[in-house]
UniProtKB/Swiss-Prot annotation:
The protein's name in its UniProt record: Glutamate--tRNA ligase
GO cellular component assignments: cytosol
Quaternary data: Monomer.
Functional note: Catalyzes the attachment of glutamate to tRNA(Glu) in a two-step reaction: glutamate is first activated by ATP to form Glu-AMP and then transferred to the acceptor end of tRNA(Glu).
Lineage, broadest ranks: Bacteria, Pseudomonadati, Pseudomonadota, Gammaproteobacteria, Alteromonadales
Gene from which the chain derives: gltX
GO terms, biological process: glutamyl-tRNA aminoacylation
CDD domains: GluRS_core
Gene3D superfamilies: 1.10.10.350, HUPs
Length: 470
């Protein structure tokens, strides 16, 4: 039988990291078994579902590279199918109409809670003969009264629920719309889902869904319920811990490879290995190796992974992601070197693409002012001779390559009888406006001859003004 998994988010908000990890695990299991991955939008909560949330989910999935083989399917477009199944269940006697009012159900629940009992419907209408009435009703599933529901969870091991703990679940509301637990069952059956990977908050839904599947004569999928993700303080991960939306991580300069690598390790491991390519994830991933204990989100670890991928992936690929951040920071990419060259020059130090874009600004536009600390230390009168001489050599050079530029700086230092730093640091501040940059030969090459000469002139004017003011 072909393995088929699904990710089935509700479009009531963004794609958060917990959902993204569940989607990743489900996607990896399908890919590792040569199977298919289905995307299903569970939008039966019409009041809370929005198109904006659907778009955010699709955008997050696409950005992470979690491509789906089928879908996206929408539950609201399948209402006729749900009604067809409910009609059959009524006919087969596995479901019934319940005319109990909300007031009666509420009173029953309050009485049970006062008695220290778990609230559940008492099946008053279960054996009722068909009624000739216009009174509003819900439709309930006839849950078995005896026995138990057992299933082997790939994460948590054997789980068992007594049927006496389960009441007769509402599968259709008074307005005729089907309920979540029922729609999920029909969808998984119709779509041939063989593995259900989801959060541990769905464990209590599982026995109810299994009983409905059995009543329909449908095959049962296998289940894997993954633990929640916690913040670094041990509380459930939320906005107060920082970014929780997948696209917020994009906005903060993370690569999809870094987030994917981090999330796969947040509850799953393969020995001591930390870095996983997508190919390795697919080859090595196993549902049975997922840890059933909650995992704590560690931003520093994610940053470390992000820096690793910025340094190690193809600069041309990094540049594709960097372009979004350059545009976001209103940096004109047409007014400077090609982005892959910027990535090659700056990737060694950058932890995020936001940082990389910010530090690249002087390659594309004039800096407003010199960094005060760097200028005070390095743009002093004593630096004037070095800047004048290196400017002359740069102006007359026809070779604007890294080795030639390095030689010019070296020759300037030798002629003046000073160390390389006495030439290099004033030149760096002149060219970039600050005290940090890639190697000077690379920086000069990327900024270009004309722009570099103008910036040295600007630094010389700064020194002259400093002398005049003293």
């Amino acid at each position: 039988m072909k393995v088929k998994t699904r990710f089935a988010p509700s479009p009531t908000g963004f794609l958060h990291v917990g959902g993204a990890r569940t989607a990743l695990y489900s996607w990896l299991h399908a890919k590792s078994k040569g199977g298919e991955f289905v995307l299903r939008i569970e939008d039966t909560d019409i009041a809370r579902s929005t198109q904006e949330a659907v778009d955010a989910i699709l955008e997050g999935m696409t950005w992470m590279g979690l491509t789906w083989d089928e879908g996206p399917y929408y539950q609201t477009k399948r209402f006729d199918r749900y009604k067809e199944i409910i009609a059959k269940m009524l006919s087969d006697g596995t479901a019934y109409k319940c005319y109990c009012t909300k007031e009666r159900v509420n009173e029953l629940r309050e009485a049970q809670e006062k008695a220290g009992e778990s609230p559940r419907y008492d099946s008053k209408c279960r054996g009722l003969a068909p009624q000739n009435t216009d009174a509003p009703y819900v439709i309930r599933f006839k849950n078995p009264k005896e026995g138990s529901v057992k299933f082997d969870d790939h994460v948590r091991g054997p789980i068992e629920f007594s049927n006496t703990e389960l009441d007769d679940l509402i599968i259709q509301r008074t307005d005729g719309t089907p309920t979540y637990n029922f729609c999920v069952v029909v969808d998984d059956w119709d779509m041939g889902i063989t593995y259900v990977v989801r959060g541990e908050d769905h464990i209590n839904n599982t026995p109810r869904q299994i009983n409905i599947l059995k009543a329909l004569g449908a095959p049962l999928p296998e289940y894997a319920h993954v633990a929640m993700i916690l913040g670094d303080d041990g509380a459930k991960l939320s906005k107060r811990h920082g970014a929780v939306s997948v696209m917020q991580f994009r906005d903060e300069g993370y690569l999809p490879e870094a987030l994917k690598n981090y999330l796969v390790r947040l509850g799953w491991s393969h020995g001591d290995q930390e870095i996983f390519s997508e190919k390795e994830m697919i080859e090595l991933f196993s549902l049975d190796a997922i840890n059933k204990a909650p995992s704590a989100f560690n931003t520093e670890k994610l940053l470390w992974l992000n820096q690793h991928y910025i340094k190690s992936l193809d600069p041309a690929y990094i540049a594709q992601h960097l372009a979004w951040h350059m545009t976001n920071q209103k940096i004109d990419m047409t007014n400077g070197p090609a982005l892959p060259e910027i990535v090659s020059a700056l990737s060694e130090r950058a932890k995020t693409l936001v940082e990389l874009a910010t530090t690249s600004r002087y390659f594309f536009e004039e800096y407003e002012d010199f960094d005060a600390t760097a200028a005070k230390k390095h743009l002093r009168p004593v630096a004037e001779d070095a800047l004048v001489l290196v400017k002359q050599k740069l102006q007359t050079s026809d070779d604007w390559t890294d080795p030639a530029l390095h030689q010019i700086i070296n020759d300037t230092a030798n002629e003046l009888g000073v160390g390389m730093g006495k030439v290099g640091m004033p030149l760096r501040v002149a060219i970039t406006g600050g005290g940090q940059s890639p190697s000077l030969d690379v920086t000069l090459r990327l900024i270009g001859k004309e722009r570099s000469i103008k910036r040295i002139d600007r630094a010389l004017e700064f020194i002259a003004a400093r002398v005049a003011a003293s």
